[in-house]
From Swiss-Prot:
One of its GO terms (biological process) is protein import into chloroplast stroma. Its EC number is 3.4.24.-. Binds 1 zinc ion per subunit. The gene is FTSH12. This is ATP-dependent zinc metalloprotease FTSH 12, chloroplastic. It is a multi-pass membrane protein. It comes from Arabidopsis thaliana (Mouse-ear cress).
């Protein structure tokens, strides 16, 4: 915008051209001509056009007063003054104005250059970049999508993003009025909900809250106003009196009830009073909007403030402190502040309990707080003492005994001091102390263990270093002393073993007596001998006998010593064989070898090392033992014993390591008699001792069991006050062991009391039932040995008969078809005897007999000896090839009831035939039992009377009584068939084959 102004020149002033030419020299600082004030203006806002006549200028051109000269003089004076001021400034402060002007001019030149370059770039952008950009964005280039390059794809994403952003901004702009309206509405609603009604009750609540914020908890202030007569009147409405009493605050509902129950107040007065108290409950009672309520609040608070000021001038106050509340409030504040610091200060104080801290007076402590010299304070648990830590100075820590000051915590918080609480009774301090001491404890433990390890290592090194020196001293603990000939013979007589034991003993004695005859011919003799068998059969006794017989060194150990000893098992194995080789020829005996050579020994690292050391010693390789295989030093025989040979590792028992296997089984009847003689030697035996009569009751006994039997018989004889051991003592011990296993052992007096409490009819029924079993058992020529029968054993209302299998049946290890049939017949004896004596009114006391009969009948049906179903697969095994033997020495293997055997799939006809065969066996044996008892009724009655009189009868007594009664015996069901080689007659021939063809037909119950 340009404005043209025409004016007439003042005749007192020279021409404007000259004035303008000299005007650029005004100022305190002198600038170069090219950087004058007029040169810096690019665009003038005002243009002034002036015109003057030439006469005006020429009229004053001669000498005399002139305004131009005056202006020039003033300008020159100003320039000189500016130069002097600049020189003085430069002299005083070192500021050079000319240098500063040069720098400013240089900066201005740079700015002009930058502006010029920017103008050039802007022109280039308008003339080149914009047209090329418009050409690049033409539709002809965009519609050919196949020829798009990466720039065009990126530009598409940028355009899309810009479009979305623009849409979002447009949407925000469109929604801005609505959002602003909602914000205002929300603000209005919030303020409406925030500012309550200015009722007296709300005013009272507000005053209480302000009082609680301004004063500590527990402080109560009572006000007394001075009346005109000079007396003090208690003002109960003062807020300081009940500000902390929450229960005094009356709820709106209770106020309504109080006003409503008052009959002296009229209805209108009640409404007005409710409105004044703010409990009217009507929604329309709100005093305007929140702005009006806020104004009302301000007016009411001003009135309350003015009223308080007026009352306070003529009032007196009484201050009361509830010390319990003050302490409780202080504790809550300290605990709340402590939770932020995590108890680090208190932990530091508790760890440095031993440090001396001087006491600081409480007033000095407050001064230190005011001067911000305190860094942290730690309250004790009883809030009576402070541990103060200063920011600087010496000492840094003090102890302050504090009173119960309600303003103390506020003062501490205002000072910005760290607060903590020392809780000595809480366990987490001890845990933190323990964690702090744990590294030191671990270091001490590591040093101790290192010292122990070094000590153990040095001991092992010394042991290996001086092994040769101490071997012989240790060898005395392993090598049994060699006895003379008489001792050897006596030891030989004490050993009662059968089989190939003595043949093996002779073979070993021949080798150990002259091993050179084998070494000269490069013959490797037996390396290891494995003794196996049930416990107590004499395996260890055989090893001792071998040592006694040979008179050679005998190194012995138990398998448990290699796993439970302090020395490693591998070292002990190497030590044993080293001692044996130094004293070769010698024996090495290890009992319970399965402890170190079992199948699972390799799973344990310690047992695996022991096992590998044993294998290396048995192999006898020179690289491992240092001794050639064919050397006299290798004349060592390894003997081991175990009760479980099937549990040994296969690598251990292979040939070359274990070359001989010897099974030492249970002794037979003859050997048991001999063992009884060995163990009863030196004891006082009565003349009636005949162990041969009781040998059938010791089937399955080992040598150790017989030794225990003799010892128990001796103890019983001493208990009875006898000096000799009688036959009855041995019988009593056998009965005691049997009845203890059944849990029915009683003393004689207790047994008599129990028998007297049972009725005669009950005893007679039990006697008849048991006599039936006894009679049928003795009618078979080769039935099990009958030990004894007893009524009411242990006081129970039952009877028991004890039978032992015969020796030949036990030796053969299997049962026969006839044996099972005999067992069924004898099992029928109890119920059949009741039917013979009492008729068909049979009791249910034979439940166990029926179960046994059914089980045996099923075994007979599925037995291969069955005439009709012997070749039919009626059962199948699950997961097992061989079934183990039955426990308790039973000869009948109940395969049907075995958990790993299940019935095979049968057709309807085979199932029916199975049932018929089962029933047939039961009925046939029952018929045999009934016929035998009817034919031998006199024997049945005799045995019944004996049981009623004595309550006990032995098998020998039954045999003696039956000899004179001419019993009708059964045929022998288990008599073996014997062939006489001298008899030239043909073998007996049966027209009826053992296996009849199966008669399969549909049963009536299964026909359709």
């Amino acid at each position: 915008m340009e404005i043209a102004i025409s004016y007439k020149p003042n005749p007192l002033i020279s021409s404007s051209t000259q004035l303008l030419k000299r005007s650029k020299s005004f100022g305190l600082v002198r600038f170069p001509a090219k950087y004058g004030l007029g040169a810096t203006r690019k665009k003038q806002l005002f243009r002034v056009y002036a015109s003057e006549s030439s006469s005006g200028s020429s009229s004053n051109s001669d000498g005399g007063f002139s305004w131009v000269r005056l202006a020039q003089s003033i300008r020159l004076g100003a320039e000189r003054i500016g130069e002097k001021i600049g020189e003085s400034v430069k002299t005083e402060i070192g500021f050079d104005s000319e240098e500063a002007s040069g720098r400013v001019n240089e900066y201005v030149a740079r700015v002009k250059d930058s502006v010029h370059k920017g103008h050039h770039e802007l022109t280039r952008f308008k003339n080149e970049t914009v047209p090329s950009f418009i050409d690049w964005n033409k539709w002809e280039h965009w519609k050919d999508i196949r020829n798009w390059d990466g720039k065009r794809v990126a530009a598409l994403f940028i355009y899309a993003f810009a479009l979305l952003l623009s849409c979002q901004r447009v949407y925000v702009a469109i929604q801005a009025p609505r959002v602003e309206r909602e914000r205002r509405e929300l603000t209005e609603s919030f303020m409406e909900a925030l500012i309550p009604e200015p009722s007296p009750g709300n005013i009272e609540k507000f005053k209480r809250n302000m009082w609680r914020k301004a004063t500590p908890k527990g402080l109560k202030l009572k006000r007394f106003i001075e009346a005109p007569d000079g007396t003090l009147v208690h003002d109960s409405s003062y807020v300081g009196e009940n500000a902390w009493d929450d229960d005094l605050e009356t709820t709106e509902g209770s106020l309504k009830k109080i006003i409503g129950r008052n009959a002296r107040i009229q209805t209108e007065a009640k409404k007005k009073l409710s409105q004044d108290l703010g409990v009217s409950g009507e929604i329309g009672d709100s005093v305007g909007n929140w702005r009006e309520r806020l104004a009302t609040w301000k007016e009411m608070l001003e009135r309350e403030k003015l009223s308080e000021q007026l009352n306070s001038s003529a009032a007196k106050y009484v201050v009361e402190f509830d010390m319990k509340e003050v302490e409780k409030s202080l504790r809550e504040d300290v605990i709340g502040r402590t939770s932020e610091t995590e108890g680090t200060r208190a932990l530091w104080i508790s760890k440095r309990w031993w440090r001396y801290r001087p006491k600081l007076p409480y007033t000095y402590f407050l001064q230190k707080l005011d001067s911000s010299e305190v860094a942290a304070v730690v309250f004790t648990e009883d809030l009576k003492r402070l541990y103060v830590t200063m920011k600087e100075g010496f000492p840094l820590e003090y102890i302050v005994d504090i009173p119960l000051d309600p303003y103390l915590f506020e003062t501490i918080c205002n000072a910005g001091v760290e607060v903590d609480l020392l809780q000595k009774r809480q366990i987490h301090y001890f845990m933190k102390v323990f964690i702090a001491l744990l590294p030191g404890i671990l270091i001490l433990w590591f040093i101790r263990e290192s010292a122990m390890l070094l000590l153990i290592t040095s001991k092992r090194f010394l042991y290996k270093k001086y092994n040769q020196l101490f071997d012989m001293a240790y060898a005395e603990n392993f090598i049994l002393p060699v006895g003379d000939v008489s001792e050897t013979k006596s030891m030989y007589k004490e050993v009662v073993l059968g089989g190939d034991v003595w043949d093996l003993l002779d073979e070993l004695m021949i080798y150990m007596g002259n091993p050179m005859q084998y070494y000269e011919k490069d013959v490797a003799f037996v390396r290891g001998v494995l003794l196996s068998g049930p416990p107590g059969t004499g395996k260890t006794l055989f090893a001792r006998t071998l040592a006694k017989e040979s008179g050679l060194p005998f190194v012995f150990a138990s398998g448990a010593e290699f796993t439970d000893s302090e020395k490693s098992g591998a070292a002990k194995i190497n030590e044993m064989f080293s001692i044996a080789r130094r004293n070769a020829p010698a024996f090495v005996f290890v009992d319970e070898i399965d402890a170190i050579a079992g199948r699972h020994a390799r799973k344990d690292p310690r047992r695996r090392a022991t096992f590998e050391a044993l294998i290396a010693q048995l192999d006898g390789e020179k690289e491992k033992t240092g001794i050639d295989r064919f050397s006299l030093r290798q004349a060592v025989i390894f003997i081991c014993a175990t009760n479980r040979p099937d549990e040994l590792d296969l690598e251990f028992v292979r040939s070359g390591r274990i070359d001989r296997r010897l099974y030492i089984g249970l002794p037979d009847a003859k050997q048991r008699v001999q063992i009884f003689g060995v163990h009863s030697a030196g004891k006082n035996l009565a003349e009636d001792i005949d162990f041969g009569k009781l040998v059938f009751r010791t089937v399955g006994f080992s040598g150790a069991d017989i030794r225990n039997l003799v010892n128990e018989a001796a103890i019983m004889s001493v208990r009875k006050g006898r000096s000799y051991i009688y036959q009855q003592d041995i019988v009593d011990v056998l009965d005691k062991q049997l009845l203890e296993g059944m849990g029915v052992l009683l003393t004689e007096e207790e047994q008599q009391k129990c028998e007297q409490s049972v009725s005669y009819e009950k005893k007679r029924l039990l006697a008849v039932h048991e006599a039936g079993h006894i009679v049928l058992a003795h009618l078979f020529p080769r039935f099990d040995w009958h030990a004894f029968s007893q009524l009411l054993p242990g006081g129970k209302e039952t009877a028991v008969s004890v039978f032992y299998p015969r020796e030949d049946m036990v030796d053969q290890g299997y049962t026969t078809f006839g044996y099972m049939k005999m067992q069924m017949v004898v099992a029928h004896g109890g119920r059949c005897a009741e039917r013979v004596v009492f008729g068909d009114n049979v009791t249910d006391g034979g439940k166990d007999d029926l179960e046994k009969i059914t089980k045996i009948a099923r075994e007979m049906v599925i037995s291969p000896q069955s005439a009709r179903l012997g070749l039919t697969q009626l059962v199948k095994k699950i997961g097992m090839v061989d079934l183990p033997d039955n426990p308790d020495g039973e000869l009948i293997k109940y395969r049907w009831d075995h958990p790993h055997v299940m019935p095979a799939e049968m057709s309807v006809e085979v199932s029916e035939l199975f049932t018929r065969e089962l029933t047939r066996y039961i009925e046939e044996t029952e018929e045999l039992a009934m016929n035998a008892l009817r034919a031998n009724r006199h024997i049945l009655d005799l045995i019944t009377r004996e049981l009623l009189e004595k309550s006990r009868i032995t098998g020998l007594e039954v045999e003696e009584k039956m000899k004179d009664l001419s019993p009708l015996m059964f045929e022998d069901f288990v008599k073996p068939f014997q062939i006489n080689p001298d008899d030239e007659e043909l073998l007996p021939h049966k027209d009826r084959v053992s296996y009849q063809p199966v008669d399969l037909r549909a049963a009536p119950l299964h026909r359709s």
